[in-house]
């Protein structure tokens, strides 16, 4: 798990004019602003001609006219991570980092992600999809308590509630329903919280060292993700070699099952029997000072700047039109 990733060092000048797309209009805008600024500074330090572009304040027409040769997507959540932007970039013929429209859309939808994983025989907690007509009082009878309620299309723990008792179901549902028409109710897996960064595409996709996250009181919420210095991270995680290998292998299989490309992150819970359970996929992970992908890269000797350059060097359009008859 600790072997270095060996790849040729990209020529910064050959990358051309790079746009760092950040900000946006999702509930994760503030995180994206931090990610984008970090990526921008890292690319500049590596000699890349990089420019910030806030998709929440500027138009698609302005993006098309900006003269970028490629873009680094440092957006999180809706409109930036859900396939919407990726489809627009395909139409513009502008190479971009990360997954294509389909994989981005699937991965952003936690319900569809779990359905794909189950179809591939990959372990993920039991779940139900709730709407306004759902009989909330009966859900714990099937999924057990505690359970998790979350909006299917948000990240960074936005709108998530850990429901401890029947009386908490209504409030937890209302919190998640602020963000989505449907709510994902998920079996709670007690254990250790793990995450695995994956770099590459297809057969070349490979896992970086497993990270364990230990938040105060087990509460890895928005504050503890991005601002708290109390959260502890262990990279590589202190796991038996066989368990670490299983988690890394499952991360790559989960990533490939969704058709992810370029880079991403897969989140897990590890139960008391050392069985990993897939939680969700992130196709545009955070790149802040507290973020996990840079931490995993550092563990194999890859600096933050090297990581950013490596990711943007693989920017590409993912939808290929069939050849036209002349």
Curated annotation (Swiss-Prot):
The keyword Ligase applies. Mg(2+) 1 binds at residues 267, 280. One of its GO terms (cellular component) is cytosol. Its cofactor is Mg(2+); Mn(2+). It catalyses: 2 D-alanine + ATP = D-alanyl-D-alanine + ADP + phosphate + H(+). ATP binds at residues 140-195. Binds 2 magnesium or manganese ions per subunit. PANTHER family: D-ALANINE--D-ALANINE LIGASE (PTHR23132), D-ALANINE--D-ALANINE LIGASE B (PTHR23132:SF23). This is D-alanine--D-alanine ligase. It comes from Bordetella petrii (strain ATCC BAA-461 / DSM 12804 / CCUG 43448). The gene is ddl.
